[in-house]
Amino acid sequence: MSLNPKLQHWQGKTVWIVGASSGIGRALAEALHGAGARVVVSARQAALLLEFAHAHPGSTALPLDVQDAPALRSAVAQLQSSHGQIDACIFCAGHYQAMRAQQFGLDEAVRHLQINYVGALNLLDALLPQLLRQAQAGRGGHLSLVSSVAGYRALPKSMAYGPAKAALTHLAEALYQDLSPEGLGVSVVHPGFVATPLTAGNDFHMPALLSPAEAAQAMLDGWADGRFEIHFPKRFTLWLKLLRILPYSLYFRAVRRATGL
């Protein structure tokens, strides 16, 4: 069952990817540009964005930090002026550092929240009025938040990352309930392990590891089907979904057995 309008034709559509300098965001920008979209890429690393824009004619580099709410408001105003419509916005910005309770650091934990969750709130503050205006004019739009399977339930070494992603998933669910009746699409993406700069420092085995290009294709397929939740690879994520419904006595035992921690 489709929960969103199906996004199957990208030709001429304006797509803003926030967090597009590397990893999934960069691969998604490349795939959407190849599908004919007018891609706008944002992240902190201006040089990488300009390199992308130079190599992909018709795309736009818009450097910013998701922790800077005024910068996001300025970016939306600029896009409204230059592109008119924002057909889709994908929040891919993320920060990850493995953390267990024995190595807890307040500054690092707060940094996870500021980028992974508050960054999304800053985006909403800037973007929602524009999307609602588009909806009232019958033009619609789509907002997608990239969360993680680490947000399903607590996993070892995800003491800072997991709670921030769980909050992002909850936010997407709330947004869908409010915005779907307005004619706006909302989706949440739960990737498993993807070979990105964020996961490169992991010192443990990452099962069912995907390339960023494979992750981007899974997202495009999910939007084309009108899904609310897009999770991949299913051979890994379905097991985590099963863990999510187990009682705590079985859940903790299963996680310890699977991870050895």
Protein language model annotation of sequence segments:
Residues 124, 164:
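Active-site helix of classical SDR
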Residues 21-22:
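Conserved glycine-rich cofactor-binding loop
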